[in-house]
Each structure stands twice: as C-alpha cells, then as structure tokens.
Amino acid sequence: MTTVAEAELEAANEIAPTKPPKLNTAAFKAVPETRALRDQVRAAVEAFCKTIDKSKPLTRDISREMSEQILASLGLGGQYLGFTMVMLTNEFWREQVAAIPFNRRLMLLPHCLKNAEGCPAEYDEFGLDCKKCGACEVGDFRTKAEQLGYKVLVSEGTPIVLKIIVSGHIDAIVGVACLNVLEKAFDKVLLAGIPCIATPLLSSNCKNTSVDNDWVFESIDLHTPPAGQKTKTYMHLMRAANAMFDEPELSRLVPRARAASPETDPLRKHEAIAYDFLARGGKRSRPFITLAAFDALKGAPATLSDSGWELSDSVKRAALAIETFHKASLVHDDIEDDDSYRYGEETLHRVHGVGTAINVGDYLIGLGYRLVSRDRKELGSDVAADILDKLADSHMKLSEGQGAELLWRDAPNKALTTLDALKIYALKTSPAFEAALYSGVRLAGSVEKYEKMIADFSRNVGVAFQILNDIKDWTGDHDNKLVAGQDVCAARPTLLLALALEGSSPAQREELLHLISTARTEGTDAEELVGRVRALYFSAKVFEKADKLVDKFRAKAESLADEVEPTEFREFLYYLVDTVLEKGELPRQAITQFVQLGM
C-alpha cells in the first residue's frame, strides 16, 4: 500500500483548514406564540423578498443570514429563526409554485395532525391512508387538494418524496410539517431545486398538533400565470439521467443484441440479467455529473427550463457508460465481500451463482467501453479516445484500490494507518467522480485547463464521500437491509478503524486488532463483535475525528472550485459538493441495532 502516486499522498496531507462548526439549531425552532406575531413576521418577509434576486438558488446559509436581518429589523429574538427561514423560503418560491398546474403538485401532510385517539386510518407503504372521516384537518386538506388535482401523501419521509420528484411526476411541493421535520428536509429540497411552500405546525409534539388552517388552504389554492423569473435547478438534468435507465429508453439508447432470440436462449437470459442490474437501484449520480458538467460548459440551459434544450444520444451514452462501469464494480465487489444484498434485493451471485455474476460484471465492463467507442464518429475520434483513456485509467485505479483492500483483509497483520486508509479511498472511490466529471467536460470541448482541477477536486470529494459512507455504516441502512457495523463484520480497512488504532491505548489497540482478525471467522458472534468495536470507537472518538476530516476535504474541494470559470461550471461544482457530501447524524453510543431484514 505504499506504491500509490505522490499526488494522492500529498492530497491526504495537504488539507484546508476546518470550517466553523454548523450552528446548533435546537434553540431556534420556536413558533411565534400569537397569530398577530406570526402575521407580523410573514409580512416583514414578504416585503424583504421583493428586493432579492430569485434566479439564484436559495441555500440554508443565505436563508439564515436574510432571516437574521429580518428578525433584527423587527426587534425579535433568535428563537424564531427557524420559523422565519420557512417563511422566507415560502416567499422565495411562492410565485413559481403558483404558476405550476395543480396536477403537477404534491401535497405533503403530517400524520401528527390526526386525532390520535379516534383515527381509523391505517399506514401503507406511502404513509397514512386517510379515511376522510372529518375528525381532524388532514381529511379537509386532503379533500381540497385532491379536488384541485394534487397528488397527496400523509407522510414525513423525505426519501420517498425525493424519489417522486426525480421520477418527474411532480414539479412543486405544498406541505405542512413541524419545524423539526422541516429542518431535516430543508437542505434536500433546496438542493433539488423544487419549488415548495410549507406551513409550520404550531408545535412539535408529534400528537394532536394544530396549524393555521387558513394559511394551509391559501397555499393549496395558489394559482397565477407563469412566473416571470425562474430559479436555476438541476432537477431537469437529474430527471434526464434517471430516465435513461427506464424502458423503453434504455433499450433504445443501448439496443439489446439478443432481443430477437427465444426467451429460453441462454444468451438472451444473460443479456437480460445484465440489463436488469444496470437499470436497478442507485441514485444515478455519476451519469448526472457527466450530463450536468456538459450542460454547465454549454451555458447551463437545462438549469432554467425543461424544454428548449436537448442532449444528443451520444452524450447520453457516454453518461451511461460511467454508470455501467460502476454497476460492474458493484457486482464484483459483492462477490469479493460475499455481500447478501444490493439495492434491497439479493446480490447477483446469491441469485445466479458466482460464475454467472462474474461474467455479468465483465459483460458490463465491455458494454461501457463500447458505448463510447461506437459513437466516435458523432463525438469525434479524439474526444472518444480521451474519454476511453480516462475510463481505463479510472478502472485500473479502482482495481488497485480494491486489490489493496482485499490483500489487507486476507493478511494476518491488521495494522492500518490513516494514511493507508486514505490512499485506498483515493483509489477506490475518487476515480468514479473523476471519470464522470472529466467525460462531461470533454464532451463539451477542450479539457486541458480543467484536467488537474478535476483530478484534485474529485480526489477530495471522493475521499470525503467514502468517509461519510464509513460513518453511515454505523447507523445501518434499511433500504439495503443492512445492520450497523457491516464494515467490521467484513473486516474492511476503513478510516474509522485506522483512527481507532492510532487513538487507543495499547490494551485497546491489541483488543481491536484481535476483534478485526477474527471478524470473518466462522462462529463469531456478529452482534457482540459490533458492540465491542463500537465501544472502542467511541472511546477513541473516531466518529468526531472522521467528521472533522470530512469538513477538511470538503473545504479543500470548495477552494479548488473557487478558482473555476465559467460561473455555471463553478456553481455546479459547489452544488456537487453540497449534494455528494451531505451529512447525516453521527452514530450514537447507545442505539437499538437494526434487525436484519429478510433473513
């Protein structure tokens, strides 16, 4: 693990200063006690918003700064900051929400408005199935919204809402929620660039709560001619990236060579397995990066409209190639780690056998190269050659990183330094970001002046992203049917392990090395193993240390983006940092372990 390029070694050592810690918002979530005071804050926000430029996306930091100004002008305390930020966001988007047809809007209602003692409704996969019995406001709001053509969900789950947004079924959200829920959803909705209006609940009790009903009905009824000023959003490009994997579009872009063969033909079956896995699951972030980088260097027309711009099939196929390589690596990784689930379903090798799964991964690699090489006439031979070279380089780095991880896992000596872990991350995770970003830039024109920046930026983003994944591993993952601590059970060389080894006492270090060395031994009690390692990690404060490293790598990536021109490309790089490096809560010392689903 000492033969990695000097650039990666320097990147691990040269880290920008840590940003100031994020504001603790617990003391800023009070709702003004009287309706008169709520109306006063809203009126001040409306007046303030008449002066701001709504073509630029609103961020949490900008919203907080503006809200603090408004509260200061009213002589009110900071306890109303969260409420004021919601009012500001509402006013920012109000005109654009009003211009969107009712049948393209989603009404999102909280279950805590229901009458807890007598509610006859039951829960399904989408939330509370309201019976409209008249015992609470939920039915009234739902009836009104559905009469106008809204899609309605009684749920507070952000993931399902984001899936609906990306799928292209809605263009705006009108919601009701407490300030705690709105805070959690704030960054996701703003980053998605989806017009939204939310009416805050008057308390966060999560039971028999109340709301300003007339404000809710007002937001449901909003309807005006198309807005004169639109805010930039990457939603159109997210949807374009997502749509490439839906049928019949996937088979149109990448025709199935064996489609005419009988269904019983093994060649057709093998092709179907590969296409099914290519289309399955994932956020499609890598092809999105390629499309968005290409668009940014073409003036970013797709960020202002879902019409008037078009991506050629050759550009789409190049973006598809990035995801094809990613999916191939997942198939092979799952075999090497003997993982049970991927995207909430059994892994390919568990369903079809190791041999078939290996071959499907190889098939996807070949398909990825062919997607670019077959379009060299449309792209230009030099463009195709440059992209193929970058894909090959990324493929080799990924294999080096995975190889180093496997050799460490199977070696008797489990010593690991933070530098060792960071070098593996720079090889395993960063190349995918680099290939996606490079391809988009090269499709748009010359890449020469961006090449070093792309490599450095991708390295910092990729390493930070992998550290966040390490942290997330300790909170579990319901979507992929994983319990917390899977990296320990698989004896992976993570940064968290390296930090623990370096920050523990000799006795703790010896115990940790023993635990990792026996993690994959038959008969090991996984729950006991994870519990003991968790305790050692907390003793060494590894989660806090890892979180600070994420901040440092993020700051370095942002400093690289600061120097980039044109503005559209620089703004996309900032957006990429915000979305890829979105943080969750740090693991808690005492949590209830997730139950392994489907076992």
Where are these regions (language model features)?
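Mg2+-dependent prenyl diphosphate-binding active-site environment of isoprenoid biosynthetic enzymes
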Residues: T264-R509, D578
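Mobile late-domain/C-terminal helix-loop "cap" segments
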Residues: E510-V564
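Short, amphipathic C-terminal "tail helix"
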Residues: F553, T567-M599
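Charge-patterned, long linear interaction tracts outside catalytic cores
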Residues: M235-F277
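Conserved mixed alpha/beta catalytic, RNA-binding, or beta-rich assembly cores of soluble enzyme
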Residues: I62-D171, V176
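Ser/Thr/Gly-rich flexible loops in soluble cytosolic domains mediating phosphotransfer, phosphorylation
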Residues: C196-K232
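Electropositive, gly/pro-rich neighborhoods at or near active sites that engage anionic ligands
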Residues: T2-L106
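Short, structured coil segments at secondary-structure junctions
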Residues: L148, L191-I194
